[in-house]
Regions:
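Boundary/linker segments flanking structured domains
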Residues: 1-59, 63-76, 82-195
Length: 195
């Protein structure tokens, strides 16, 4: 059934994706992924305290590298936290990933919203929405258990339309360069309008 689905054609001119006030229908947001830093066996991370950049918490991706793995920089887990230093001291899923042979590292995503400055509460909600969308998009290789069975935007907090650009570290091409969410997938019928 999925082979018949295709993306709905909203036109190639993205400047037409504006509302009546001339604002984008899909709110632009950029996630700049930092180079991964190794998570030590005890859960410590050699990250500087960048409280100004991360004052509303962290969006992160755990990355696995193992010598016998067929792929490099495999994204294993997407998450959010308010304190990176404490988060990995006792996190059952991360402990399980970290206990495997090979290296486990973390890449922190710095979120920016061109033209707007979300307040603390709005930034926390934005972080939650982005985490959910990334889990939904990257689900195939992830160890995440939560947020995999509910469509983003359908939970208790609702959701918004986003045009997400991922820059910085590219995870060997495994992180999509751009995610436009939500988008419509359609199964077209045979067109019988021609005479």
């Amino acid at each position: 059934m999925r082979k018949r689905l295709r993306l709905a054609d909203f036109g190639e001119d993205e400047t037409l994706w504006l509302n009546g006030s001339g604002k984008p229908l899909f709110r632009p947001v950029e996630i700049c992924w930092r180079d991964p830093v190794r998570i030590e066996r005890d859960g410590s991370i050699a990250l500087e305290n960048e409280a100004d950049v991360y004052k509303h918490g962290y969006l992160y991706a755990l990355v696995r590298n193992h010598g016998n793995q067929a792929t490099r920089n495999r994204i294993a887990y997407i998450g959010i936290t308010n304190d990176l230093q404490k988060r990995f001291k006792n996190h059952p899923k991360v402990d399980q990933i970290r206990s495997m042979a090979g290296e486990t590292s973390i890449s922190v995503g710095v979120i920016s919203t061109p033209g707007t400055r979300p307040s603390g509460t709005a930034m926390v909600q934005l972080r939650e929405e982005l985490e959910h969308i990334l889990i939904w998009v990257l689900w195939d290789d992830l160890w995440n258990d939560r947020k995999t069975f509910v469509v983003p935007g359908q939970g208790g907090n609702g959701g918004r339309a986003w045009d997400i650009s991922n820059t910085g570290f590219v995870f060997s091409g495994r992180m999509p360069k751009r995610i436009v969410f939500p988008w419509a997938a359609i199964e077209p019928r045979r067109n019988n309008t021609a005479r």
